[in-house]
């Protein structure tokens, strides 16, 4: 009898860990970033502006980036880093190539665990969402005019939301421009 009681606390810990992870996988999160040249490090002047919306759960994140007044976009990344520093790329969202043609100001897609690189390579979605909730990630948009970045914005979490009961489960469009 003592043997079974001794295992009870251990089994409770295991059950709590499983419940916590599955609760995270079902939690809806929403984050936003306002993109401008003034957020670049160092700051640059650009008339271009943009927004990045990220929404999803512990399994995947959908993103949509809208840009106006921008020239030829050559790349878009999510970086790990504070607002005042340049950090490592953790997710590549876009790289220009001849077959895709130019980006017209709207970029949308999905981030999964296989998207991670740099400090997040081999890690899970929770690692990225933890960084986002700590305001330690930013979106950076590169152009031919500003190869080190024309638009940048810290990704700020909007909290946990209830799962949308609609047919798209709250996901954003995945059409690229």
Regions found by a protein language model. Name each.
Residues 21-76, 80-177:
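Metal-centered catalytic cores of metalloenzymes
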Residues 9-18:
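Bacterial N-terminal signal peptides
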Residues 3, 14, 22-24:
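Short, intrinsically disordered, low-complexity terminal segments
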Residues 1-10:
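Bacterial N-terminal signal peptides that target proteins for export
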């Amino acid at each position: 009898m003592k043997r079974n009681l001794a295992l009870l606390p251990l089994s409770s810990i295991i059950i709590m860990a499983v419940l916590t992870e599955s609760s995270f996988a079902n939690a809806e999160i929403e984050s936003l970033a306002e993109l401008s040249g003034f957020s670049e490090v160092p700051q640059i002047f650009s008339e271009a502006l943009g927004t990045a919306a990220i929404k999803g759960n512990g399994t995947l994140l959908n993103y949509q980036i809208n840009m106006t007044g921008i020239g030829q976009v050559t790349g878009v990344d999510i970086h790990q880093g504070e607002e005042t520093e340049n950090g490592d790329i953790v997710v590549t969202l876009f790289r220009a190539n001849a077959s895709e043609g130019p980006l017209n100001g709207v970029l949308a897609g999905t981030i999964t665990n296989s998207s991670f690189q740099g400090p997040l390579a081999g890690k899970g979605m929770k690692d990225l969402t933890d960084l986002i909730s700590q305001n330690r990630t930013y979106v950076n948009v590169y152009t031919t005019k500003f190869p080190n970045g024309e638009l940048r914005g810290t990704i700020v979490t909007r909290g946990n939301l209830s799962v949308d009961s609609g047919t798209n489960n709250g996901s954003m469009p995945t059409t690229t421009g």
